[in-house]
A protein has these predicted regions:
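Short, structured coil segments at secondary-structure junctions
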Residues: 42, 62-63, 149
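Hydrophobic helical membrane-anchoring modules
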Residues: 201-202, 206-229
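Active-site acidic Asp-centered loop
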Residues: 104-105
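Conserved core of the sugar-phosphate nucleotidyltransferase
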Residues: 82, 100, 109-203
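Short phosphate-binding loop-to-helix
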Residues: 47, 53-101, 111-121
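Alpha-helix/helix-capping structural signal
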Residues: 53, 185-186, 215
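N-terminal glycine-rich phosphate-binding loop and ensuing alpha1 helix
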Residues: 2-49
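Short active-site oxyanion
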Residues: 42-47, 130, 206-208
Length: 229
C-alpha cells in the first residue's frame, strides 16, 4: 500500500487574507498540515496543491511535494474533487499511482498525527474499501430539524422525534472536514471522496475547529496556546 496525503491550499481567501500562510503556534496552516501528515508515520508522500507561489514555496521548505494548480481549479466555486484529480495526475507523472488517498484540509490546524494514523488503520483493516470520514457529534440532532416545503415546515423524519430526548435518538455526526481517507482508484472512478461503506473516526472538538473567519483564527490560536499544540 502506498499512501498519499493531498493538502489543498489555494491562495485566495476573502475572510482571512493569505489564510493558509497565517500562523498558529508558530507554524503556518499549510506547514502544520504537512507536519501532521509526516508525523503520522502512515503517509508515504505529502503533496500540496496550490495556485499561490508563496504557499508552494512554503510547502517545499516543509518537505512536501508542491504541485501548481491551474487558476480555473482554484476559484471560490471550484470543486475540491477536480483539484485532487489534478494533483493525482501530476504526481503520477513522476511516481507510481498510490493506492490510498488522505485529504487534509489546512484549515483544521489542530488535527493530530495520531488521528491520521488511526483513520488510515481503520481504512486498511476493512480491506481498503469504502472511505473514512473524520466526524464530530452533531451539535443539533438532524431528527429535530425541519425541511421547508410549500405546505410549511415538515420534520426531517417524524413529529415524534421532535419531542424525544437525545438519548432516545440514534447518535448523529457531522463531518469535521479535518480528514478523509479513500482508495485512489475508487476516488478516480467515482470522482468523489464519498464511497460506501462510510466508516468514521470521531475527532476532538479542538481538532474539528475550522478556520474560516478571523474569529475562528483567534479561537484556534487560543486553544493552541492553552494545549501547546
Amino acid at each position: 500500500m502506498t499512501c498519499i496525503a493531498i493538502i489543498p491550499a489555494r491562495g485566495g481567501s476573502k475572510g482571512i487574507p493569505n489564510k493558509n500562510l497565517v500562523e498558529v503556534g508558530g507554524q503556518s496552516l499549510v506547514t502544520r498540515a504537512i507536519n501532521s501528515a509526516v508525523q503520522s508515520g502512515v503517509v508515504d508522500f505529502v503533496v500540496v496543491s496550490s495556485d499561490d507561489r508563496n504557499i508552494l514555496e512554503a510547502a517545499k521548505v516543509a518537505g512536501a511535494i508542491a504541485i501548481e494548480r491551474p487558476a480555473e481549479l482554484a476559484s471560490d466555486t471550484s470543486a475540491i474533487e477536480d483539484a485532487i484529480s489534478h494533483a493525482l495526475q501530476k504526481f503520477s507523472e513522476g511516481h507510481p499511482t498510490p493506492t490510498t488517498l488522505v485529504l487534509l484540509q489546512p484549515t483544521s490546524p489542530l488535527r493530530q498525527a495520531s488521528t491520521i494514523s488511526d483513520a488510515v488503520h481503520i481504512f486498511t483493516k476493512n480491506g481498503n474499501t469504502g472511505c473514512v470520514y473524520g466526524v464530530i457529534e452533531a451539535e443539533h440532532h438532524p431528527y429535530k430539524t425541519f425541511i421547508a416545503t410549500d405546505a410549511g415546515l415538515q420534520p426531517v423524519k417524524s413529529v415524534e422525534d421532535l419531542s424525544r430526548s437525545r438519548q432516545e435518538l440514534p447518535k448523529a455526526y457531522r463531518q469535521s472536514g479535518s480528514i478523509y481517507v479513500v482508495g485512489v482508484q475508487d476516488f478516480l472512478t467515482n470522482n468523489s471522496l464519498h464511497v460506501s461503506p462510510v466508516r468514521w473516526i470521531e475527532v476532538s472538538h479542538k481538532e474539528a475547529i475550522d478556520v474560516d473567519t478571523p474569529a475562528d483564527l483567534d479561537a484556534v490560536r487560543q486553544v493552541a496556546s492553552n494545549f501547546d499544540v
